[in-house]
Amino acid sequence: MERFIENAMYASRWLLAPIYFGLSLGLLALALKFFQEVIHLLPSVFSMAESELILVLLSLIDMALVGGLLVMVMISGYENFVSQLDIDDNKEKLNWLGTMDSSSLKMKVAASIVAISSIHLLRIFMDAKNVDPQHLMWYVIIHMTFVVSAFAMGYLDKVTKH
């Protein structure tokens, strides 16, 4: 009975595979949205104000960071919890494949969230005159919460490894 339960629990990790594949569909949706923004940007690039262009570019950077986060979670999560990726030797291989454990993945995710939050906050600051000061304060508080959380996670990870 114990062996059956252990085998069933171990096999249940495969339930994560469609979830990680679903993230690739989310990445596809993000890529479509990215290029939709680029297509909207190109015809009006010469007529828009510099600050407006910067806001659009920050939005594109934001999407790129989220895309990188999706790839990182999708691939390293699959490798850590489901199965090793069997990539042909003749194909281009990401240098971090097989090296990111769940602890380093958490740190990369935390750093990505802080970067995404920073971009979002910068976009808000560029339009600060149209943002309620109360909302602005909460944006900063939430961002600082992300920063402090990432720092605390890094510190705790360093302390527990040594």
Curated annotation (Swiss-Prot):
Main location class: membrane
Keyword Nuclease: no
Coiled coil: none
Annotated transmembrane regions: 15-35, 53-73, 136-156
Keywords, in A-Z order: Cell membrane, Membrane, Transmembrane, Transmembrane helix
InterPro entries in the record: UPF0114, UPF0114_bac
Localisation: Cell membrane
Topology versus the membrane: Multi-pass membrane protein
This protein's record includes keyword Cell membrane: yes
Gene Ontology CC, one term: plasma membrane
Protein family membership: Belongs to the UPF0114 family.
Family annotation (NCBIfam families): HI0507
HAMAP family assigned: UPF0114
Protein name: UPF0114 protein PFLU_5318
Organism the protein comes from: Pseudomonas fluorescens (strain SBW25)
